[in-house]
Amino acid sequence: MIERILILLLAFLPLCNSALAEEAEPNPWGVDEWTLQTSLYTWHFDPEDYHNNDQHLIGAEAYFNNGWLAGIAVFENSFFQDCQYIFVGKTWPIRQSDHWYFKLTGGLLNGYDEPYENKIPLNGLGIAPAIIPAIGYRYKMFFTEANLGGLAALTVTAGVRF
């Protein structure tokens, strides 16, 4: 019986917490907004006939109150292999613009398998560290970004913020 009462109290605890949130300082790791995005096109700097220029990327990002972000993206790499990128990052306005920004993310990239496992550095275990810089433009709830994939490609994405 006591266990059931504790379970009920725990179930209602989030409701009590939100009522007290007005008086407390905001949680710096609270999510401020979400984004969903997809790839529009990829341009390879050294193109080959076998390169995939349509990555079918689907990405989601959470932007926190403290300015940091975290996200995941799933896509096909340049060799038509399914990949995942899990990352954290940050954005900075360009010249105090409300629209233009620079974004830098870093995380783990999975999916570059044989025979292309050596196309990205440090991919010994099938998972490699990655750093992806981007330039973005946002207008109201919409945005577009140009993401630099190492020295190999530039991918243009578009998405929505909510």
Q: What are these model-derived regions, one by one?
A:
Residues Q55, C83-Y85, A128-I132, A153:
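Transmembrane beta-barrel architecture of outer-membrane proteins
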Residues G30-W34, N66-W68, D82-Q84, D98-F102, ...:
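Outer-envelope beta-barrel architecture signal
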Residues L36-H44, W68-N77, P133-I135, Y139-L151:
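Transmembrane beta-strand segments that form the barrel wall of outer-membrane beta-barrel proteins
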Residues T38, I58-A62, I86-W92, L104, ...:
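Residues on the lipid-exposed face of transmembrane beta-strands in outer-membrane beta-barrel proteins
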Residues M1-W29:
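Cleavable N-terminal export/targeting peptides
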Residues A21-F64, A73-V74:
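Short glycine/proline- and aromatic-enriched beta-strand/turn motifs that initiate or cap beta-hairpins
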Residues Y50-H51, K103-A130:
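Outer-membrane beta-barrel translocator/channel fold
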Residues E22-P28, F64-N66, G89-Q96, Y139-M141, ...:
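Outer-membrane beta-barrel proteins
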